[in-house]
A protein has these predicted regions:
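Small-residue-rich hydrophobic transmembrane alpha-helices
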Residues: 52-112, 156-175, 287-353, 384-406
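Short alpha-helical transmembrane segments in multi-pass integral membrane proteins
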Residues: 1-23, 80-152, 200-258, 315-380, ...
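Hydrophobic/aromatic residues within transmembrane alpha-helices of membrane transport systems
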Residues: 28, 40-44, 55, 80-85, ...
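Helix-terminus/linker motif at the lipid-water interface of multi-pass membrane proteins
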Residues: 31, 35-53, 122-136, 192-203, ...
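Transmembrane helical elements of multi-pass membrane transporters/channels
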Residues: 21-40, 148, 159, 182, ...
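Generic alpha-helical transmembrane segments of integral inner-membrane proteins
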Residues: 27, 31, 35, 39, ...
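Small-residue hotspots at the loop-to-helix junctions and early N-terminal turns
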Residues: 49-60, 142, 146, 209, ...
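Short runs within selected transmembrane alpha-helices of multi-pass transporters and secretion channels
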Residues: 73, 77, 148-168, 175-186, ...
Length: 462
């Protein structure tokens, strides 16, 4: 029995070496990014609860925008990688054009929305349960932060268009280097501008926003300048700006195959922010506690998120080569490994996570809420690892409609209604509500298990 289990679910050293060589650079890059985000969050947290909450709410809104951008570039990347693999540089150029158009269209829509409805969107997350006027102060800081952050949306969009195309050519170092430079710049400028160190004025939340915007421009410039200085490695740039068209066949293919993926990213992100809005009706303390908890959780969930993402790459390679049996075997082993690693990280987070809220300059009530939210997240995290791995297994076989149903439709049909009903129509405490809503992941685990087991994803597309 044990030997059978080991053969099916545990690989040899060569297997894990290949898997980890792919995953570790991605884990490190995301670890550095999230660590800087954590430091940024702490620095803003030193300013006070209202400042921290205002910034956290705006970041929730920008999170939806970011995922919309990722969805737009992912839709074209499905074809971009294959165009490059075939040596079809013109096709690769058309996918690049699509990314530019799609990301700039999304950005234009986001800026228009934030300009006209920004205050109203922020106010959705502000419920004054104690009558001390703190929500008005948080709204003011949120408006200040959003006004500056909008300036950084365009370079972010253009950078994603370039960086994803560069990665499709196998040149992953430059986007990673640009990201490291950006997060380092962001961290340094955060410290100088938030607190007014040296010649810099004390700008508070405006300083945090300005530091992020400057870092976005630096990252975009590094990537764009490198791409145009190395045209031989970036053949998709040939003719990219000498015309504006995309052949109808290519455009239709990208939209048909990529639209569910694009909508999935947007709807899932919107669903998650809606869940947060449901929690926020329980007061500003809840918003602040969730902000602290999510920042800490993001430090610990990097491992399972990146291990899960690698599944689509490794399994996709086997499927593309027609090695369907090997694809199923690798998938079983990688899912088990991802969950195993997540159990270790979750246990670590459960033990040490409670120490982090003490760093913040906020009330003991908020620190207590954050500690309990972190503990709940640690308990649920291994289940999230399994459903995440299941999602990328289905995606590796090109089942974009299935992943759309599995991810965003599940969020809107199960998670959002659960959060809304529990927050608005029960007398349960917020921690109990949070646990029950997070617990809906169990349903997703069961669905994911049967979907993966059905082998509906075992498809050779090329």
């Amino acid at each position: 029995m044990l030997a059978k289990f080991k053969k099916k679910y545990i690989g040899d050293w060569d297997f894990y070496q290949k898997y980890l060589l792919l995953a570790i650079p991605m884990i490190l890059q995301n670890a550095i990014t999230n660590l800087v985000s954590f430091l940024d969050n702490i620095m803003v947290g030193q300013l006070g609860t209202e400042q921290m909450s205002g910034v956290a709410i705006v970041n929730q809104l920008i999170f939806v925008y970011n995922l919309a951008i990722f969805g737009a570039v992912s839709a074209a990347s499905i074809f971009g990688a294959q165009y490059f693999g075939k040596g079809n540089h013109k096709g690769h150029m058309y996918s690049f054009r699509f990314k530019l158009y799609a990301t700039l269209l999304v950005t234009g829509g986001a800026i228009l929305l934030f300009l006209t409805k920004g205050s109203a969107l922020i106010s959705l997350y502000l419920t004054d349960t104690v009558g001390n006027g703190a929500t008005d102060v948080a709204l003011k800081y949120g408006q200040e932060y959003l006004a500056i952050m909008m300036v950084g949306l365009i370079p972010f969009a253009v950078n994603q268009s370039y960086a994803t195309n560069i990665k499709e050519t196998g040149q992953t170092f430059i986007p990673m280097l640009a990201s490291f430079v950006a997060v380092g710049t962001n961290a340094l400028l955060d410290y100088l501008m938030i607190f007014g160190i040296g010649p810099f004025p004390k700008m508070g939340v405006q300083g945090a926003a300005l530091a992020t915007v400057i870092a976005r421009y630096i990252e975009a410039l590094i990537v764009i300048i490198w791409a145009h200085m190395h045209r031989a490695k970036n053949r998709y740039l040939e003719g990219a700006y000498t015309g504006f068209g995309i052949p109808f066949a290519e455009l239709k293919a990208i939209l048909v195959k990529g639209f569910p993926l694009m909508m999935n990213e947007v709807m899932w992100a919107a669903g998650m922010t809606t869940v947060t809005q449901c929690y926020s009706v329980r007061g500003l303390d809840v918003v602040a506690g969730l902000n602290i908890a999510s920042t800490i959780t993001n430090l610990f969930n990097i491992v399972y998120l990146q291990l899960g993402s690698c599944i689509s790459i490794v399994v996709g390679q086997y499927l593309g080569a027609g090695k369907l049996k090997e694809a199923k075997d690798a998938d079983d082993k990688m899912i088990v490994f991802s969950v195993f690693c997540c159990v270790i990280m979750a246990a670590l987070m459960f033990v040490v996570g409670g120490f982090f809220p003490g760093i913040y300059n906020t009330s003991e009530e908020i620190k207590g809420l954050a500690t309990q939210f972190i503990a709940v997240s640690a308990i649920i995290m291994p289940f999230c690892a399994f459903s995440h791995a299941s999602y990328f297994t289905l995606r590796s076989g090109g089942k974009t409609v299935v992943t759309f149903l599995f991810d965003s439709v599940f969020t809107w049909v199960i998670v959002v209604p659960a959060a809304y009903l529990l927050a608005h129509f029960t007398g349960l405490g917020i921690v109990s509500i949070y646990f029950l809503v997070q617990g809906t992941e169990m349903i997703k685990v069961i669905i994911g298990y049967y979907m993966v087991k059905s082998n509906v994803w075992v498809v050779q597309m090329v």
